[in-house]
Every structure is written in C-alpha cells, then in structure tokens.
C-alpha cells in the first residue's frame, strides 16, 4: 500500500509539473494581448446604459434616433460575426485582430468626436463590426494557443475582461462624459494593436497553411524551451488534416440535427431574452422603475464581475446543463 501511495503521489506531482510547465510567462502575455480588446467589447455593451440622457441632450436627439444609435452595435456585430470565420481562416487570427482594431478604434473616435447623429451612428456601427469579429476570433485564438490542461481557465479570461469593461462603463457613466468613456474604449484596442507585433500566429492556422516548421517554433515558444511538443504538434497536424475535408454543408447532415438545434437554439434564445437591450438601457430602466439610476448602476458595476467568476465556479462544479435548466 505504501508503495502504491508513493506511485500515486509521484503521478500527481508529474501532472502538476506538466501543467505548470505548460503555463509559461510568454503564454500569459500572449493571452493578455489577445483578450485586451475584450474590455473594449464590454465598454461598448455598457456605454449607452448610463449616458443616454447626456448623449441625447448634447446632440439634441429624439428617442427614436437614440434607439437607432443603440441598436447599431447589434447590427454591426451581426455583420462582423458573419464574416469572422472566413477572415480568420483566410488570414489568420492575428491579422483578423488587426482588422478588428481598425474598426474599433475608428468607431470609438467617431463617437468621441461626433458633432451630429451621422458620425455617432457610423461610429457605433463600426464598433459593432469590430466586436462581432472579436466575439469569434478571441476565444478561438486562445483555444488554439493554450494546452488542454489550462484551456478552460484561459478562455474564461475573455468573458472576464468583457464583464470588467461593462462594469467600468456602468460605473463611469454615473459621472463621466460619454465622450471620455468612448476614449477609454480605445485604450485596450491600442494595447492590443501594439502588442500584436510581439505575439505569434496561431500554431493551428500555421499548420493549416502548410507552415509546419513555423508551427513547431511557435508551439515551442509558447510551451517553453524544455517542453516536449512532439505529441501536441502531431495532434494539431492530424486535426488539421481531418478537418480539411469538412465543409459547412456537413453541419446540416441528419446525424448532426440534434446538436445543431441545441447550439443554435441556445444562442438564439439568449438574444431573444432581451438581455442585450436591457444592458443598453439599464439606467433608463431604473429611472422608469422609480429607482435612482446612479445607485442601481453602481450596484450593477460591483456585481457584474463577481457573478461571472461565480458562473465559472458553478459550471466547473455542476456542469452546464443543470445551470441552463435553472436559468
């Protein structure tokens, strides 16, 4: 028994050593650069929540004009998401993020400097296209550079940064100019724009393009000089080869109907719940309910990030299906 316990302890130590070896400083830095613009995504979601009255007053907008302005983030997001996979497959995740920043930075600048409804709407639409691209490429990029042992935690950083952005917009909307908040939305985009010069392309995309040597070099850099990447490299190459003959049409085969219905249904029902609209006009909802919007927005800004962390903990403990049933 003593020898058996010793073997188990050694095995656990090896697993922990492997996990810690996989999480290198360069991997953490690369992930930070990739998810940094997710903060801007969150700011975009919360930008109108506490600034509706001041935007309407400054630019003399009607309720209808402001409603169009708010909805353009969603319309732009639909267009960005529609082309995100094609752009990422053709040019790589890194180039897609550069394209994203062109839309996000120009969009935020147009909002911050807007003197009329045209520039305001154009800016919101451009930011929408940017966050539509982000919503696909960021989680995919992270998943393709991280090892399996820490993939879930690293991918969660995308959602965490989004919630941090929402919380920031909610809180600052109580006392700060909507133009300044728009400029704050640019800061993480600039961090990503510069940081992308120092991070590698996705190893999987490099393998798909037939650049196997570059794939190995990038993977070695991400995992550390002493890490054995032979097995992981082979897994990537096999995966790329297997997916080469899979087309979008394959998803609509009868055997995938159940999975496809669940996947699309969950995403569709999430949007039809009205959560996006509620997020855009949270301050107004509080006012109409007779509750001080400043207090409500402040409380929400405090709750948003912890609830995201709680969600991760509950998912890890109980799984996704029970939580969806409770919701």
Swiss-Prot record:
Superkingdom of this protein's organism: Eukaryota
SUPFAM superfamilies: MFS general substrate transporter
Keyword field: Membrane, Sugar transport, Transmembrane, Transmembrane helix, Transport
One of the record's GO molecular function terms: transmembrane transporter activity
Subcellular location, record wording: Membrane
Topology in membrane: Multi-pass membrane protein
Residues passing through the membrane, by range: 26-46, 68-88, 102-122, 125-145, 152-172, 180-200, 260-280, 295-315
Gene3D superfamilies on file: MFS general substrate transporter like domains
InterPro entries in the record: MFS_dom, MFS_sugar_transport-like, MFS_trans_sf, MFS_Trehalose_Transporter, Sugar/inositol_transpt, Sugar_transporter_CS
UniProt key word Transport: yes
GO CC entries: membrane
A matching Pfam family: Sugar_tr
Principal location class: membrane
Function: Sugar transporter.
Family as reported in the entry's similarity comment: Belongs to the major facilitator superfamily. Sugar transporter (TC 2.A.1.1) family.
Protein name as it appears in the record: Sugar transporter ERD6-like 9
Organism: Arabidopsis thaliana (Mouse-ear cress)
């Amino acid at each position: 028994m003593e020898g058996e316990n010793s073997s188990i302890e050694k095995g656990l130590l090896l697993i922990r050593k492997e996990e810690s070896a996989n999480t290198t400083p360069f991997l953490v830095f690369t992930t930070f650069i990739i998810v940094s613009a997710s903060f801007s995504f969150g700011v975009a979601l919360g930008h109108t929540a506490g600034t509706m009255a001041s935007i309407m007053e400054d630019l003399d907008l009607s309720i209808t004009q402001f409603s169009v302005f708010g909805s353009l983030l969603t319309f732009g997001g639909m267009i960005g998401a529609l082309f995100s996979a094609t752009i990422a497959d053709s040019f790589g995740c890194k180039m897609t993020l550069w394209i994203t920043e062109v839309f996000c930075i120009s969009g935020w600048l147009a909002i911050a400097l807007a003197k009329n409804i045209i520039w305001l709407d154009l800016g919101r639409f451009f930011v929408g296209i940017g966050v539509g691209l982000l919503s696909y490429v960021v989680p995919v990029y992270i998943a393709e550079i991280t090892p399996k042992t820490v993939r879930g935690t690293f991918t969660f950083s995308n959602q965490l940064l989004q919630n941090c952005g929402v919380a920031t917009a909610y809180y600052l909307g109580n006392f700060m100019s909507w133009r300044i908040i728009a400029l704050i939305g640019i800061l993480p985009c600039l961090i990503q724009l510069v940081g992308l010069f120092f991070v590698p392309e996705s190893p999987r995309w490099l393998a798909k393009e037939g650049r196997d040597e570059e794939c190995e070099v990038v993977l070695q850099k991400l995992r550390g000089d002493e890490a054995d990447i032979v097995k992981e490299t082979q897994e990537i190459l096999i995966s790329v080869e297997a997916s080469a003959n899979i087309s979008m049409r394959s998803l609509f085969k009868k055997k995938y109907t159940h999975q496809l219905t669940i996947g699309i249904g969950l995403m569709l029902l999430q949007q039809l719940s009205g959560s996006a609209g509620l997020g855009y006009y949270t301050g107004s909802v509080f006012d109409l309910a007779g509750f001080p919007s400043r207090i409500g927005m402040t409380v929400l800004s405090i709750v948003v990030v912890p609830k995201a962390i709680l969600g991760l903990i509950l998912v890890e403990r109980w799984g996704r299906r029970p939580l969806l049933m409770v919701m």
